[in-house]
Amino acid sequence: MLEFHADRKRYFDIQVANAEKYVIPFIEEKIRINPGMRVLEIGCGEAGVLKAFINKGCFGMGVELDAPRIEHAKEYLAGDYAAGRIQFISKDIYQVDAEKELGGLYDIIVLKDVIEHIHDQPKLIGWMKNFLKPALSADRPGGVIFFGFPPWYMPYGGHQQMCSSWLKKIPWVHLLPKTIYRWLLKRNKENADAFLEIKETGISIERFEKICGKQGYEIENKAHYLLNPIYEWKFGWRGRKQVGIIKAIPFVRNFFTTCVYYLIKVK
């Protein structure tokens, strides 16, 4: 697993394939993605997800605080970058001016495997209205936001698969009390601060939906996965949606749902 994330080009290629096979079809269940649409990804990394949208004729803008990852993205998308089909900015999203730095508003905003790392998630989710195109008519319904994330209570919701020790094989270990978890991490020479930060920011299905409602959004589409679609490339397991009876049980569903997709829009 660690090797998978360390090989950035392979990870980029997998993100492209996953977005083309799962993310874009999920969005297109509700809106058609047409050439010329503007797509903003917050926390874009190497921009593999954005590449899938560019392949459909969209313009992509990637926001990423980790500048070296943007340099990798520029390398992997050299042709698209040179042609102006994608641009990047390395800046705190709260300091970004939509008109001056992003070139205007967007049809689609993407946060994939990002929201579970964000402090003050209500603030960010509310703030994104500043970058969405407004609804003008039935034919111009306004922008949407896509989220993909692992619920905190799922077997590896603490991202402990990134550990270098035996802890990477232990499901739900991240749910131990903080003091015990910290001791285990330090005992096994892991980066305790990094994994404990995820413990602070992890988000459940119910909390995410509650935040969206309080911030003035409505849910356009959602999919809960028993097997995360990305597992198709990691392990050879095809993405599989959660069974209805589990999906219908609040809180309990978090423990057995490895990934959720949501599409939201302003009410």
Segments predicted by a language model, with ranges:
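Conserved N-terminal segment of class I S-adenosyl-L-methionine
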Residues: 1-104, 108, 125, 255-262
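Pocket-edge positions in alpha/beta enzyme catalytic cores
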Residues: 11-15, 117, 200
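Active-site beta-strand termini and strand-to-loop segments that position acidic
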Residues: 264-267
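A structural helix-start
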Residues: 67, 118-119
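Adenine-nucleotide cofactor-binding loop residues
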Residues: 94, 115, 153
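A short beta-strand submotif of the Rossmann-like class I SAM-dependent methyltransferase core
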Residues: 111-112
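S-adenosyl-L-methionine-dependent methyltransferase catalytic module, highlighting the catalytic core
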Residues: 119-131, 137-262
